[in-house]
Amino acid sequence: MSAAIVNAVKQCGYFNQGQCLSCRHIQQPLAQQVAVKTQTLQQLLAPFIPANSAELFLPPITGDDSGFRNKAKMVVLGAAHEPVLGIVGPSGEAVDLCDCLLYPADMQALLHRLTRFVQQAGLPPYRVDKAKGELKFILLTRSQVRGEYLLRFVLRSHNGIERIERELPALLAEYPQIKVVSVNIQPIHMAILEGDEEIFLTENTRLEERFNHVPLFIRPKSFFQTNPQVAAQLYQTAREWVAEFSPRSLWDLFCGVGGFGLHCASNDITLTGIEIEAEAIACAQMSAQMMGLENVQFMALDSTDFAKGKSAADKPDLIIVNPPRRGIGEALCQSLSEFAPKAILYSSCNPKTLAKDLEHIQGYHLTKVQLFDLFPHSDHFEVLAMLVKD
């Protein structure tokens, strides 16, 4: 990325007018944002870095500062004849976010079309204050490989499904790149994003994505990185770091749809992927099948429980962990220390819990740390840390 782009300030009308403050650092140049994040990371990990070892921190990886996000979570507001897709603003007003700069142009256009779809279907937006209405959220996910979409309508009940089905053929004829459509039923009168019941309105139930020639699949409830450009670099870096150890066996804990493990896999490596979300495991299994991988096992289990149930004799050469923001926790840290693999690759979306976990992983030292700016304009970022056995 050129210096001019990195040092430019993004102009966002929503932020300037005080309507949406989610991108709290959008008025800072990207280079400045990344410098602050780098400093934060270095301070948090300072206790684990030997003196005169600043070279452990590799240069941060950045991507575009707009049009990078592949997922939109839109609250549906307003009325059936005049719906608004966006957020509730700071003053309680409905803010239309269809032109949010984080979304690619084709995604912005589709969001505008979905506003008209809601109007044509006559779907009344759910009113939290009155506990009335039907349509709560519209969730839209984009695959960068073909510009295809997964579209979800979150409803209070089954009452709105018929209206969606009535208008859907015209929408799909206009936007054939919408490959998956589903309705999620969320009956609870609370600000919860989704419920347990998912009803597919298309034959397709998953969206294909591809990073570094690795096929990955997205289903409605499976977690997937929201910045494909930087996520692809994150997975590629993990692949290169793991290859340095030539492992014959590998665990991928909190594996999600298998992004890390599948990037590192080959038929010479025995790969075990563990993830509690069954939908994500189904996606990972499909990817492994497409890649022709034979020594691969993906299981829908709790990662901590899985590790506790294993003996030292089962230990792999290398373990990858990619936990949610809470980190891996003391119990799993203890299990990793006892298994004593050659190396542990830790991918973290919360450097505070990474630092906390590092206190409890015994017998290892950091050899590489790299920041990946998956979330421009926010305080958040991803970190890849390589721990090697003492």
From Swiss-Prot:
Residues at which [4Fe-4S] cluster binds: C12, C20, C23, C100
Active site: C349 (nucleophile)
Binding site for S-adenosyl-L-methionine: Q225, F254, E275, N322
SUPFAM superfamilies, sorted: S-adenosyl-L-methionine-dependent methyltransferases
Transmembrane segments: none
GO molecular function (one): 4 iron, 4 sulfur cluster binding
Signal peptide: none
Family: Belongs to the class I-like SAM-binding methyltransferase superfamily. RNA M5U methyltransferase family. RlmC subfamily.
Protein name: 23S rRNA (uracil(747)-C(5))-methyltransferase RlmC
Species for this entry: Shewanella baltica (strain OS155 / ATCC BAA-1091)
Gene it is expressed from: rlmC
